[in-house]
Amino acid sequence: MNHDAAYTAIQSLIAECAGDSDRFAERLRAERIPHLSFSQVSTVEACPYRYYLQYVRGIEPEPVPAYFTKGKLLHQLIARDYSNGHGEQPAYEEELALQVSGENLAHLLNALALHRQNAWRGVEVLGVEHPFVMSLEPDLPPVVGVIDLVLKDDDGYLLVDHKTGRSFYPDDELQVAIYARYIQQAYGENICRLFYDHYRWVNHLSRIRKPAFQRVEVRAEPTRWPRDLARIRAAYAQIREIWENGAPLRCGECFRCPYRGMCRS
């Protein structure tokens, strides 16, 4: 499938999935439509062998790390709150207790409380878990992503990405650049601000010494786009080689990798 056909196929898939980002991601994987994403770029940069396991062979980590489950659940709950317009706000405790327990349940309930204290208000919600596709240049596959929250105020567009973890981890400017590029293509708008809403997993909100929530604005610098595009091209060259030649050598920071228990020695 050439890049133009892939772009058209992904556009159709987004329309068919009607904003259901989980269904969109599942269909995209199942149908193996050629594409790139920020996650693919960052994964192949971190470890080509992890890319091979995750994207070529389609293997899920075993066992699934608890932070995967918690992160996905929190994203779903936050999306539901914004989709409901912050009207009725269920506690979700009984629902969550069917899926997680112990400190993992406490982590989620505390993060949900922090979200509700710090939710974006007084802005127009344009998209929740908003899937998109865009073409960067003819020699690259279409780029796909899902923006957690697309907002608009009097000054322009606000994009929000939710991050979860035991700590507040550094942000990657490439993700910001990709999102900003999409807004420019889709809306013809150059004023675009991106925020990371970070949630740190904690057992007790009343006992913490440092914040468990942090909102950080990250700016996309247009002058850096040539460098960002070069990074995407370099990652795509690695990805093509993996698809054509098979499993590469591992070379990542294994202690942080969810696949480390499955990785060859």
Spans of model-derived segments:
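Nuclease catalytic cores
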Residues: 33-87, 127-130, 256-259
